[in-house]
Amino acid sequence: MPELSRFYGIIIRMYCEVGPRHLPHFHAYRGDDEAVYGLDPIELIAGSLPRRQARLVEAWAELRQSELLADWNRLQSGTEPLPIDPLP
């Protein structure tokens, strides 16, 4: 699964998942914690992260939503996603 970004100990990844049941989303990992966020709108759809890390991921995703959606489309068409800048 390609790593799109990494910041503050959080790793952002995205799977290539095809089919109408798979809404655009990404996975955020921190240690043993994992959360899945939808892209439109940016919202937690599964799992959990500690509150501070969840806020960081949500802020980052809001800033990078168009890039995340573009990477989702790249993956679904069989193309490698592009890296996305982390939070400063």
Where in this protein do the model-derived segments appear?
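Basic nucleic-acid-binding interfaces
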Residues: 1-88
